[in-house]
């Protein structure tokens, strides 16, 4: 089986990849990695929000899936559009790793310690809006490139701190660079953050069945709720929307924010219910927040 993974500098660690898990589960199968640089990875001199379009980190990979070049694709779920191309499906969602955002600094231990006017690096509008809502004095500068590049820019003194997904740092062996985790009441994570998604052709039942062992039910229910919320708002990964669903037994709690780009307005709400109703609860929360002012916030952005 041939698998696509994004090639992002030195970031793809084969020992931690889905390929390694497949080889262990099915030692009789040959697993071949095909790597690709996507549009979102190639264009590094323009902020993601200005590139435009959805699927910046998935389009080229999905084209190879559809034409049969590869059998499955591995994505960070947070990069996946809520609507997939016809003929493709998410066949497994792995157990979620650390869902939070990491505060990384060589000078300060926590976000709260940053002095007035500190320079903070992030390429995420979601993070920028929420950080400015708490600290409008901060100077938020765009930060692109792979994880190694971003850490190097911090070490060169271009930023006082940078914000990265904690799961990504930990997967790549950079967990020791995390100064602290940013609390959810300061910065709610992105849809699907911390989970890996396995995409395959809908008609390829054999491959989909083989991948079922990778699926984590709690993570799937939580991320289904988050993606349902995002899908109802029709927001891509470059809109200031944060949402986190937490499954405890049979119950689920979903918390979400819709923010203005400058953080001047943030709408926050939660909903609770049964985990089996994850999708409908995510949609309910989306409708409620749109009616409460979210529509106006999004209209000012889109």
Indicate residue ranges for each PLM-predicted region:
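A conserved helix-loop-strand patch within extracytoplasmic ligand-binding domains
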Residues: 77-78, 86-138
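Short, Asp-centered acidic motifs that coordinate Mg2+ and/or phosphate
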Residues: 70-74, 160-161
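Short helix-initiation/N-cap motifs at beta->coil->alpha
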Residues: 36-41, 53-61, 141-153
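A C-terminal functional module that forms or caps the active site or interfaces directly
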Residues: 220-289
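Single conserved hydrophobic/aromatic residue that forms the stacking wall/gate
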Residues: 1-7, 13-14
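Pocket-lining segment of extracytoplasmic ligand-binding domains
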Residues: 141-225
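Short, structured active-site "lid" loops
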Residues: 45-71
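Beta->alpha turn/N-cap motifs
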Residues: 37, 76-80, 164-169
